[in-house]
UniProtKB/Swiss-Prot annotation:
Binds 23S rRNA and is also seen to make contacts with the A and possibly P site tRNAs. It holds the Pfam family Ribosomal_L16. Part of the 50S ribosomal subunit. GO terms for biological process: translation. InterPro entries: Ribosomal_uL16, Ribosomal_uL16_bact-type, Ribosomal_uL16_CS, Ribosomal_uL16_dom, Ribosomal_uL16_sf. Belongs to the universal ribosomal protein uL16 family. One of its GO terms (molecular function) is structural constituent of ribosome. It comes from the Bacteria. HAMAP family: Ribosomal_uL16. This is Large ribosomal subunit protein uL16. Keywords: Ribonucleoprotein, Ribosomal protein, RNA-binding, rRNA-binding, tRNA-binding. The lineage of its organism: Bacteria, Pseudomonadati, Pseudomonadota, Gammaproteobacteria, Pasteurellales. GO terms for cellular component: cytosolic large ribosomal subunit.
Length: 136
């Protein structure tokens, strides 16, 4: 599972997922999976999508993961009264804004890439689209 090796603070405020995305262009591979909606991806969802893509391309080509879960999400145990401090860190998420390229792929044909990204998109909670690298 993806998570930071060390952080400055163990727990963070909830905050809001606003703003515009960085990393909106396909930069490493030839094909990409771009977010259309806004949301957050857990480390488990990122890994599930990666596994689906890897199986679909039969370990050919190369896959880049352009998102990293760096925000800790806390939860209180079941049947615990409110108060008594913030809960324990349960999982890590990556905040996604519209336009962010989340995955990239190279070394496979476009049909294979489209199929692999379709399988990966089914594992993700946000709407996505298939993009290709624009050559200047």
């Amino acid at each position: 599972m993806l998570q930071p090796k060390r952080t400055k603070f163990r727990k963070v405020h909830k905050g809001r997922n606003r703003g515009i995305a960085a990393g909106t262009e396909v930069s490493f591979g030839t094909f990409g999976l771009k977010a259309v909606g806004r949301g957050r991806l857990t480390a488990r969802q990122i890994e599930a999508a990666r596994r689906a893509m890897t199986r679909a391309v039969k370990r050919q080509g190369k896959i880049w993961i352009r998102v990293f879960p760096d925000k800790p999400i806390t939860e209180k145990p079941l049947e615990v009264r409110m108060g008594k401090g913030k809960g324990n860190v349960e999982y890590w998420v990556a905040l996604i804004q519209p336009g962010k390229v989340m995955y990239e792929m190279d070394g496979v044909s476009e049909e294979v890439a489209r199929h692999a990204f379709a399988l990966a998109a089914a594992k993700l909670p946000i709407k996505t689209t298939f993009v290709t690298k624009t050559v200047m």
